Amino acid sequence: MKPTKELLNEILHEVRPLIGRGKVANYIPALARVPAHKLAIAVYTNQGEVIKAGDADEAFSIQSISKALSLTLAMGLYQPDEIWRRVGKEPSGQAFNSLIQLEMEQGIPRNPFINAGAIVVADLLASRLSAPRQRLLEFVRQLSGETHICYDKVVAASEMMHSDRNAAIAYLMRSFGNFENEVIPVLNNYFHACALKMSCVDLAKTFSYLANKGVSVHTDQRVISPVQTKQLNALLATCGLYDGAGEFAYRVGMPGKSGVGGGIIAIVPGEMTIAVWSPELDPSGNSLAGTKALELLSERIGRSIF
C-alpha cells in the first residue's frame, strides 16, 4: 500500500488522543511556549510527490534533527578516519546530554547524534568552513528549495543562555584533546543549527537524499555517495532516537532522527522520506504522538528496513 492523504489524516485522527500524555520540552523556554496541540505529517516520495496532513506547512524548531545535516556536511569535508577517530558510531544508552560516559571514555563521544558528538561535528565544521552557520543555512535552503528557511534567533539565544551543561561537555572534551576551536563560538554555531525553523514538508524534501542513495530528489544533485548514505542511515537506525533508538526500531523499523522540538524524520530507502511533528515528548525526548504516527504508517503501508 502507498501513503495517501486519506491515510495520513486517518493516522493523525488516531494519534490525537495521545496529546496531553507527553511533556513539551521546558528546559529551553522558547520551546516551552509551543502549543502542545500541533500535529503534522508529510511524506515526500522518490518520484517528487508531497503527501501531507495536519500542520505540515508550519515551521518549528528542528533541534537535534539538524545533527544529521551537520554530519552530512562534515562527511563532504573530511576523510572518514578524520571524523571517526573523534566520535564513535555506537548507541549510548545514556541521556543525550550526559557527561558520565564522556568522562569514562576519555572525551570521545559515543556517536554524532548525542550532544557531545554533535558538538564535535560542529567543531569539525568550524575548522574547515569560514562561515559554518551560513553554509548550513545555504545547504538546507538548496535541498528544500525553500529560501524562507531561517534560524530562530530567539530559540538560539535561549539555548545559549541555558548552555552550561553543553559548555561543560565541550570543555571536558577539550581537556582530553578532542576540541580544536574556541568553545563559545562553536557552541553558538551548534545552537543556531538546532534553532533552524522548518516544516514537515521542508524536512521531508531536505532529507530525500537519504532515501535516494545520496541524490536529492528535489534538486537531482548528489549530496553524499551511496556508501555514505548507507552509513548515515545505519547510524540513524541505531543512534538517531537518543536512548529510545531500540524502541523506535522495534515499533517503526526505519532509520530516523528526532529533536526535542517534537519533530522526527524517518527514511524508507528507495521509496520515501517522512517527517512528523507533535511537540509533546516521551521520557526519552522523542515525540510521543509522532512516534505512534510513524508506527501506524509503517504498519499500514507495510514498510520497514527489517
UniProtKB/Swiss-Prot annotation:
InterPro entries: Beta-lactam/transpept-like, Glutaminase. Belongs to the glutaminase family. The lineage of its organism: Bacteria, Pseudomonadati, Pseudomonadota, Gammaproteobacteria, Vibrionales. This is Glutaminase. GO terms for biological process: glutamate biosynthetic process; glutamine catabolic process. Transmembrane segments: none annotated. Keywords: Hydrolase. It comes from the Bacteria. NCBIfam families: Gln_ase, PRK00971.1-1, PRK00971.1-2. The gene is glsA. Substrate binds at S64, N115, E159, N166, Y190, Y242, V260. It catalyses: L-glutamine + H2O = L-glutamate + NH4(+). Homotetramer.
